[in-house]
Structure formats: structure tokens, C-alpha cells
Swiss-Prot record:
Family statement drawn from the similarity comment of this UniProt entry: Belongs to the KdsB family.
Source organism (scientific name): Alcanivorax borkumensis (strain ATCC 700651 / DSM 11573 / NCIMB 13689 / SK2)
Superkingdom of the organism of origin: Bacteria
Protein name stated in the entry: 3-deoxy-manno-octulosonate cytidylyltransferase
Keyword set includes Thylakoid: no
Subcellular location: Cytoplasm
Annotated GO MF terms: 3-deoxy-manno-octulosonate cytidylyltransferase activity
Length: 251
């Protein structure tokens, strides 16, 4: 199986400006993510950025693709990368978030293999079980709902599916149900990326602020499967960053 990995790395993060260059135990965030990706089976790893400072830090350790600053979503940025690299329509690109320095290489391989094995899907992604009510009712934890064939039915920031009886009268009983946290790693076919950028943002996409809903609104099948390994949460805030620094301080 052949696939590429692209790591989008924007300097102008809303909640944590300069996040890709944040130092984590002697290495920048973007370097740590790229090194994890290099341990996967990908044919090639690229970092996509709109900031020369990020490219300068990476030097010649990872190929860098400079992109425009005005992309409305990460998927749009990936399409520019695919175009600049002249990738074939049936090539597979895995998008690994630039704030996932602990991403297991095995899940990168997994999501690429899942897309390759499901020719009726144009996207593939992963999930993991939600085991506490704090995560289920947290709008920053995106929930995934999928059918018995692994096809996505919906993604939401709301606690879906809603357990009518267990959640009655303000209860938050998670027994007897299954809830899944969406993990923000995607595999795409290049032909789909060229389609995606032609579509206007969908109503549900704008309401939930979830770009995968644009694909679903246009009839695209998305494959979803539980991750083969635990995927630690990404770095969204200064608190997340400090926790990771403490965790990796001796490495």
C-alpha cells in the first residue's frame, strides 16, 4: 500500500499562537509530530505551512510545502499541497494534525489501509470509546456515529446518540450504551480533495464547525473504525502544552 502524510502547521493558532514552534523537551512541536509520522509506512512525509519560520526550523529533515495563508480549512490546504506535488487522483493522503506529537505511527498506517480497503469511501477516519460523562457532554470532544459497516452517519459536538432513558431528568448514566470520540486524523483520495474545494460550506458544517460534514452533505461516504492504539489528546491550550512538557521532560 502506498500513501503520503501531510502535516498542516499554521503559526497563527487562535488559542496558542506559534504552537508548531513550541519547545517540548528540546524539540519543537512540529519536529515531534514529523518524527512520529516518519515512523509510519508512508512513502513520504510533508509539512504544509504558510510561515517561513516553521520551514526554517525543519531545514532539510522533512520536505516542506509552502501554502497560502487564506485557506478556510485544513482540507483546502491539503488540496493545494496535492496540486503542487502533482499527485495522482487515486493517491492517498493522510492528514496528521500538527498538534499531535504523541500520535502512534500504527494509527497512521491503519487509517490509510482502511481507505485503501474501502473503494466506495473517499475519506477514512478513526475513533475511540468515550468512557466518562465529562467527555460525552464536552462540546470540544467531537462524537462519531457510524453504522455496522463502519460508514459514518454523523459527527457532532452534542452528546450523540442521546440515550433517552439513561439521560432522563438530568442523569448522565453511560452504562448500556456506546459513544465514540472522533480522532482528528483523516485519509483522503486526491480526487476527492479536488472535489471538496469546489463545494460551498454546508449548513451543518457551519453550525457544528466540523469540516467533514461538508463531505457528508454532498453524499461522500466516510469510513470510521476504532483506533488500534490509544491516541493521546492533542495540544490545544497552554495547559495541554505544560502537561506534555512535564511528561516528556526526561526524553
Amino acid at each position: 500500500m502506498s500513501f503520503y502524510v501531510v502535516v498542516p502547521a499554521r503559526y497563527a493558532s487562535t488559542r496558542l499562537p506559534g504552537k508548531p514552534l513550541a519547545d517540548i523537551a528540546g524539540k519543537t512541536m512540529v519536529e515531534r509530530v514529523a518524527q512520529r509520522c516518519q515512523q509510519s509506512d508512508a512513502d513520504q512525509i510533508y509539512v504544509a505551512t504558510d510561515d517561513r519560520r516553521i520551514a526554517d526550523v525543519l531545514g532539510d529533515t522533512v520536505p516542506v510545502v509552502m501554502t497560502r495563508e487564506d485557506h478556510p480549512s485544513g482540507t483546502d490546504r491539503l488540496q493545494e499541497v496535492a496540486t503542487k506535488l502533482a499527485l495522482a487522483d487515486d493517491d492517498i493522503i493522510v492528514n496528521v494534525q500538527g498538534d499531535e506529537p504523541l500520535i502512534p505511527p500504527a494509527v497512521i498506517n491503519q487509517v490509510a489501509a482502511n481507505l485503501a480497503a474501502n473503494p466506495d469511501c473517499q475519506m477514512a477516519t478513526l475513533c475511540e470509546a468515550i468512557e466518562n460523562s465529562d467527555d460525552l457532554f464536552n462540546p470540544n470532544v467531537v462524537k462519531a456515529v457510524f453504522d455496522n459497516r463502519g460508514k459514518a452517519l454523523y459527527f457532532s459536538r452534542a452528546p450523540v446518540p442521546w440515550h433517552r432513558d439513561a439521560f432522563a431528568d438530568g442523569q448522565q448514566d453511560l452504562s448500556g450504551g456506546q459513544w465514540w470520540r472522533h480522532i482528528g486524523i483523516y485519509a483522503y483520495r486526491v480526487a476527492f480533495l479536488h472535489q471538496y474545494v469546489q463545494w460551498q460550506p454546508a449548513t451543518l458544517e457551519k453550525l457544528e464547525s466540523l469540516e467533514q460534514l461538508r463531505a457528508m452533505a454532498n453524499g461522500v461516504a466516510i469510513h470510521v473504525e476504532p483506533a488500534c492504539e490509544v491516541v493521546p489528546g492533542g495540544v490545544d491550550t497552554q495547559t495541554d502544552l505544560e502537561r506534555l512538557r512535564a511528561q516528556l521532560g526526561g526524553q
